Regions:
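Glycine-rich helix-loop "coupling/hinge" segments at transmembrane-helix boundaries
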Residues: 120, 217-243
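Short, Lys/Arg-rich, polar N-terminal cytosolic tail immediately upstream
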Residues: 1-17
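The alpha-helix within a helix-turn-helix
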Residues: 177
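Short coil/turn motifs that cap or connect alpha-helices
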Residues: 94, 172, 182-184
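Membrane-interface capping segments at transmembrane-helix boundaries
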Residues: 4, 8, 267-278
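Glycine/proline-centered hinge or cleavage motifs at structural transition points of membrane proteins
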Residues: 180-182, 194
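Membrane-water interface segments at the C-terminal ends of transmembrane alpha-helices
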Residues: 16-48, 57-167, 191, 195-216, ...
Length: 281
């Protein structure tokens, strides 16, 4: 065997050992992430608490409130976040970096801090609380407060993903459409959104999942009022604090299954789009 062949074989063995190590580490990480969730859902299913919780008025009310508020918060997030993402990508202006940092700030803020900050703005003695109180408007500890808390903590996830998707769209394609007489709305609907749809969908899922699981800001700003501000994560906490571990596990399992179902649906949607693109190529 020549020295060069020996070196090649040795390098191949080293690379193979390194790859096996990486695969092993990846498997350990996957197990670390999946095992607690699997045990949670498995226990809820096997002991029957999941089925029982679906007949609980408290759980059903919290689930309905969670779905309703996250639908509203996601609508608000898209209505505000998508135009903002376009401006941040396509425009240059002084202080842009500061605005981007402010938008991303809720991602790293502890949720309880976010809730306290919202209370200092919208609370009865807050910055806007007194003027709103004069108008007869009270926001804290209402369903509106739940939506505001969800938008505050979840919008940055959508905006960040939308910015990445829009930045990947070739601006020359948009300019070409304008030259051909397309309006800004037509360019947006026929060029920007379709080409950035993957990133937009990912942002929607991340934002919705964050809103669905929101706890800290909600309990600080909106409270834990059954039928009014008690979302499903708050039921998990309330049942655990009350000593009903089975009910807490069941409510948590519903959250896991709902979030996982949406993630799977989006994966299937993106897989289907990829197949369509390949078929048309």
């Amino acid at each position: 065997m020549s020295p060069r062949a020996g070196q090649t074989r040795s390098a191949g063995q080293t690379r193979s050992a390194g790859e096996r190590s990486l695969v092993g580490l990846a498997a350990l990480l996957a197990l670390f992430l999946a095992l607690p969730v699997a045990v949670l859902v498995g226990r809820a299913v096997l002991d029957g608490s999941l089925g029982a919780s679906l007949g609980s008025e408290t759980v059903l009310a919290a689930l309905g409130l969670s779905l309703a508020t996250t639908a509203v918060s996601l609508t608000v997030t898209v209505a505000i976040g998508l135009p903002l993402a376009i401006v941040l990508v396509r425009r240059r202006f002084p202080g842009k970096w500061l605005l981007e940092a402010i938008i991303d700030l809720p991602i790293v803020l502890p949720p309880s801090v976010a809730g306290l900050a919202l209370l200092l703005v919208f609370g009865r003695r807050g910055l806007l609380g007194e003027p709103l109180d004069i108008l007869g408007i009270s926001i804290p500890f209402t369903t509106i407060a739940v939506v505001i808390a969800q938008v505050f903590v979840s919008a940055p996830f959508f905006i960040r993903s939308a910015r990445a998707g829009i930045a990947a769209v070739d601006a020359d394609l948009e300019d070409a459409a304008r030259v051909d007489g397309a309006s800004e709305g037509q360019v947006f609907r026929t060029i920007t959104v379709p080409l950035a749809s993957g990133a937009l969908a990912a942002g929607l899922v991340m934002s919705w999942a964050r809103a669905l699981g929101e706890f800290g800001a909600t309990i600080m700003f909106a409270g834990n009022l059954e039928g009014r501000t008690q979302t499903l994560p708050l039921v998990v906490y309330a049942e655990f604090q009350g000593g009903d571990l089975d009910a807490s596990i069941a409510a948590a399992a519903i959250l896991v299954l709902a979030a996982f179902g949406v993630l799977v649906a989006v994966r299937v949607f993106r897989w289907g789009r990829a197949l369509d693109v390949r078929a048309s190529a």
